[in-house]
């Protein structure tokens, strides 16, 4: 009888321990707020900015998971575009995407010019092949427009001049989460005194004095994933006019 009583006491004690551990461990699982977790996830790449010499990426390794084959050093993809609506039914979008293969230490991509229409009309898109050597963009396709040719050859990615060393100082953002994807978003009001905003205004024709919004979007695991992606947008849009810069830097398997 005493033996059974001791067993009962042990079981009761075990239940109490499990309950306390579960309740106490809840905060550990939750940890930082989702806003802080999103910023920390972005900081893994934004801390690398500014990447003045893109060839430095050949010697940097990103987050690796089971999608990488053995021996694959991976590939960095950097992207920047500037979109602006010129009419109520048109949106012009120009930018560049560059893939830097760490296995071959080569960088290839393209500059794109797109025009979107709201009405029943297909969008126009033209890609111009480029490569990078000695941190210089080399245009591979023939371009007759001298202004476009100059824009391509002198193009700089946002990540080459952006600086987010003070990212932790951004607080009280508007957070939204889609658990089905999952995806995470946070938005911050920026100041026109922000150096990143000043840089963009000096490089692009932004016809508004409105201070922009910084929008950070993550698809996939906050801890990191080669399947998901992170996108940063600085949105100057006002009323019915869309004006924004989109940037991302991702690390994925080079061998598929």
Swiss-Prot record:
It is found in: Cell membrane. Pfam families: DUF576 (PF04507). InterPro entries: Csa (IPR007595), Csa_sf (IPR038641). PROSITE patterns: PROKAR_LIPOPROTEIN (PS51257). GO terms for cellular component: plasma membrane. Keywords: Cell membrane, Lipoprotein, Membrane, Palmitate, Signal. Residues 1-22 form the signal peptide. A lipid is attached at residue 23 (N-palmitoyl cysteine). Its main location: membrane. Belongs to the staphylococcal tandem lipoprotein family. This is Uncharacterized lipoprotein SAR0442. It comes from Staphylococcus aureus (strain MRSA252). The lineage of its organism: Bacteria, Bacillati, Bacillota, Bacilli, Bacillales.
């Amino acid at each position: 009888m005493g033996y059974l009583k001791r067993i009962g006491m042990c079981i009761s004690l075990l239940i109490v321990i499990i309950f306390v551990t579960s309740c106490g461990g809840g905060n550990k699982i939750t940890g930082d707020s989702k806003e802080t977790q999103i910023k920390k996830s972005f900081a893994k790449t934004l801390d690398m900015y500014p990447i003045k010499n893109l060839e430095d990426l050949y010697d940097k390794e990103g987050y690796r998971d089971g999608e990488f084959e053995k021996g694959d050093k991976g590939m960095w993809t950097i992207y920047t575009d500037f979109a602006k609506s010129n009419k109520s039914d048109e949106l012009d979008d120009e930018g560049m995407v560059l893939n830097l293969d760490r296995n071959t230490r080569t960088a290839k991509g393209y500059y794109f010019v797109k025009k979107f229409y709201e009405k029943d009309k297909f969008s126009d898109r033209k890609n111009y092949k480029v490569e990078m050597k000695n941190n210089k963009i080399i245009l591979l396709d023939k371009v007759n427009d001298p202004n476009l040719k100059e824009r391509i050859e002198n193009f700089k990615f946002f990540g080459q001049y952006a600086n987010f060393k003070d990212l932790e100082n951004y607080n009280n953002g508007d957070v939204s989460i889609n658990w089905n994807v999952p995806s995470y978003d946070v938005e911050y009001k920026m100041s026109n005194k922000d150096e990143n905003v000043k840089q963009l205004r000096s490089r692009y024709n932004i016809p508004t004095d409105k201070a922009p919004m910084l929008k950070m979007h993550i698809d996939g695991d906050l801890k990191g994933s080669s399947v998901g992606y992170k996108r940063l947008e600085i949105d100057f849009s006002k009323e019915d006019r869309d004006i924004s810069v989109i940037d991302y830097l991702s690390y994925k398997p080079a061998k598929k």
